[in-house]
Amino acid sequence: RNEFMIKKITILQVLFFSMSALQAQDFPEAVTLEEAIEFGLENNRNIINATLEVQKAYKEKWSTIAIGLPQISASADYQNFIELPTSLIPAQFFGGNEGEFAEVQFGTPQTMTAGVTLNQLIFDGSYLIGLEATKVYLNISENVLEKTILEIRKSIINSYFSVLLVRANIGFLKKNRDNLNSNLTELIQLFENGFDEEESVEQFRLTLSSVETQLRYAQNMERITLDMLKLLLGFPTSSPLFLSDNLESLTTPELFQVTVEAPRTDNNIDVKIAENKLRSESLLYKYERSKGLPKLSAFLNGNYTGNSETFTFTEQNQKWFGASLFGVKLQVPIFSSFMRRANSQKAKISVKQAEASLEQVREQIFIEIQASSNEYSLAVENYFTAKENLALATRIKNKNQVKYFEGMVGSFEFRQAQLQLYNAQNNYIKAIQSVVQKKIGLETLLNSSKQ
């Protein structure tokens, strides 16, 4: 029973400290768009992994550098002959008969050797190429991190706006539902008093049912899009998160002002990656050619050896005999059956492929910037058109509503005005979304972080 209680208390303690650790994490309750971007760039899991990859590349750089620095190693060797080897020596050396052999055992049963070895690379062409390659590898890792940051930033902005746009749509749908409920109540009274037809009442109920279905769908989408935003931010999906900004505060003049005077591809991240790919292939070509160069290294070894009949190597009176050695090693490649030549030619072809790919990427990005700029300009124009159409459709619907209940227009005309308003509301939402997507897409191509 006591053991069970101890286990129970231990489990409760673990749960308590786990809950305390979770509560101690600093998660904001509400974020603006800028705060969401900042939080996401620090906590997004893809960015964290890309950052760790840069750190790995940095360590790889120092690992390569260390190859050309002094390498020191120590060793210790203990041997205990259970039976010493026997050698045969002509017996005449000891005064015996010619043609006979004497059995002799040399040395002591136990031997211990301890030493230190220093190795130093003096010249290796491939090592020098490797040093250059580590810098390129580090640059490539940094490019991947930069591309990841750009893509995550774009996704965060799009997701943040998606939540706001879904909420704006919910606002439209709720307003439409309430208006339809009010109209339906008034229409039922007219029908009961014989001033309208039953078909008009049924038509209003169908419209109301459709709007309520769309509203339920939009409310579910609000939760889903908010969870997607949390996932991008590295934020717990189970924790509440409020968005401080709204569409009014974000649809400022800056949203509709991105000017591309002369499209440049130099700062585009895909161009940077292609440039580093070319550098990498060029270094690989140099590396294959460097395999024909000689390699020169030096070493220095020093050791002490002790011999004994029994294990006395830890005693002070044990005798140790020293030895040291210095040497230089030269390796000169002579003939590889044309393998080095084939590898060099293959690497040279890869360089030409990388050059062609770089040129292709530059031209493609240049065209994409022009197309994206044109699409953004069109999206801005469509937004202002959609905004005007929404205001116009609202006025038309309100006028037709008054005329309908005054008996000046029929249910068909009123129905058309309602559908025109719903369509204008939908187009307005899509227009804002298009402006945001086109703008952030253009900024990503230009590698610009302007808001």
Per-region residue spans from a language model:
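Outer-membrane beta-barrel architecture
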Residues: 62, 117, 284-287, 329
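Terminal intrinsically disordered/low-complexity segments used for targeting and assembly
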Residues: 1-39, 88-98, 219-260, 443-451
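Periplasmic alpha-helical coiled-coil/stalk elements that build and connect Gram-negative outer-membrane
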Residues: 59, 148-265, 375, 379, ...
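Sec/SRP-type N-terminal targeting helices
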Residues: 48-52, 65, 122-149, 199, ...
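Short segments within alpha-helical structural elements
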Residues: 66, 213-235, 388-448
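Small/polar, glycine/serine/threonine/aspartate-rich low-complexity segments that form flexible
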Residues: 25-28, 75-116, 246-254, 299-332
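Bacterial Sec-pathway N-terminal export signals of envelope proteins
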Residues: 24-73, 77, 83, 237, ...
